[in-house]
Design a protein with these regions (language model features):
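Nucleotidyltransferase catalytic core that binds NTPs
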Residues: 1-141
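Alpha/beta enzyme core
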Residues: 141-366, 370-382, 386
């Protein structure tokens, strides 16, 4: 019997998938690939069910001879292992970013006489409704809130882009780039206080109140599904911060980043050119601990932003603070620098990783923007924010 292969990236089997299977059965034994979470998030949406559950879904389809694991977007490994006579897919992959996948398959199969079968894509109300329901599920707080932690487990580095409105959120949500056979998209969104304030014509001094900031979150959440990292500035008074944490958790935000400064907030990139006061380690640890204590779930991350390098307090101070903040309950450390050379950031990461292998590190390479994600990841960085 000839072998025919197809790959599914879905949480729900609908008639479109069944049409593919039924057409495939006409040509031979049907092998179905299930794409891993890590591969899916490179060009598609995040799954709402586990990888194992998706495998079981496909195993339950009548006519499927074997289920295979596809751990890359491109089909090179699968074709090398299975050597299928045919690869079948909906004809929606003839255009857009997915065309690169089809071109890759055609090239692989042509090497030994295999063929691609394009089946008319199933456009109807039932399929549209299923797709819409999956998207709605992804946008629900209980699913969105935990997604950043899930991404940290499967992505070498979580790519995050700044958003400050529903429109910029849609751009972050829908942008997919293909380059030399590799797909990329943003994994998460950063709601920056600087951009939120600027969009409202206000200075970046924590003038925009939390009620207004929460409205921005609502606008973004209404039209997106990706996890949100919230710029919490200093967090304000500890007594106020605990209520901010409760609100963010309830809304479905995945992380809040607070910086260890006090008084009237000034943009970090001003450095020592303006007066900025760093909080004491004891006070900031108390704020972190208070925020963690009021959480109802473990999903929301409180990430401590260390400003020692910005304020020229030295590497030892930065490391001392970072370790203290983690001990106080911080789920991650953000280290910032206004130097154009990434050397001090990389030095911090290396020294921090020497003592702490697991706590996520966040960087924002606004000034040292010549460094690559691969370089950052090699030094232990887990989240990169473009803002």
């Amino acid at each position: 019997m000839k072998k025919i292969y197809t790959c599914f990236c879905t949480d729900v089997i609908h008639e479109g998938h069944l049409n593919i299977i039924n057409e495939a059965k006409k040509y031979g034994d049907v092998y179905v690939g299930v794409m891993t979470d890590a591969a899916m998030v490179k060009f598609s949406r995040f799954s709402t069910i586990s990888f194992e559950e998706r495998i079981d879904l496909v195993k339950g389809i009548e006519g499927v001879k074997e289920v295979l694991i596809q751990d890359e977007v491109m089909y090179d490994k699968i074709v090398d292992i299975l050597h299928p006579d045919y690869v079948i897919h909906g004809d929606n992959w003839k255009t857009g970013p997915m065309k690169a996948i089809r071109d890759n398959v055609v090239k692989l199969l042509s090497a030994y006489g295999g063929e691609v079968i394009d089946v008319p894509y199933t456009y109807n109300e039932n399929v549209k409704r299923v797709d819409a329901q999956c998207k709605e599920k992804l946008s629900m707080p209980e699913y969105r809130r935990k997604r950043l932690k899930q991404l940290l487990k499967i992505c070498p580095i979580v790519k995050t882009i700044e958003v400050h409105s529903g429109l910029t959120g849609l751009i972050a949500e829908k942008t997919i780039v293909e380059n030399d056979g590799a797909f990329n998209q943003f994994d998460a969104m950063w709601i920056s206080s600087l951009c939120d304030s600027t969009a409202k014509g206000k200075p970046d001094i924590e003038l925009v109140d939390m009620t207004s900031r929460f409205r921005t979150i609502d606008d973004v959440m209404e039209v997106t599904t990706k996890p949100i990292i919230f710029d919490g500035d200093t967090g304000g008074l500890t007594e106020h911060f605990v209520y901010t944490v409760r609100s963010l958790e309830r809304m479905g935000v995945s992380a809040v980043i607070i910086e260890d400064k006090t008084g009237l907030k000034k943009n970090s990139l001003f450095g020592t050119e303006v007066q900025q006061t760093q909080d004491t380690i004891e006070n900031f640890c108390e704020k972190i601990s208070a925020g963690k204590k009021v959480q109802l779930t473990d999903d929301l991350m409180i990430i401590a932003r260390v400003e020692s390098l910005i304020l020229e307090r030295g590497m030892d101070d930065a490391l001392t603070r970072a370790h203290a903040y983690v001990k106080a309950g911080a789920d991650g450390i953000m280290i910032h620098s206004r130097k154009k050379d990434p050397a001090e950031i990389l030095e911090f990461c290396d020294k921090f990783r020497a003592e702490n292998k697991d706590t996520p590190i966040v960087v924002v390479p606004s000034s040292f923007n010549t460094i690559t994600e691969d370089e950052l990841s090699a030094h232990g960085v887990n989240i990169v924010i473009y803002a």
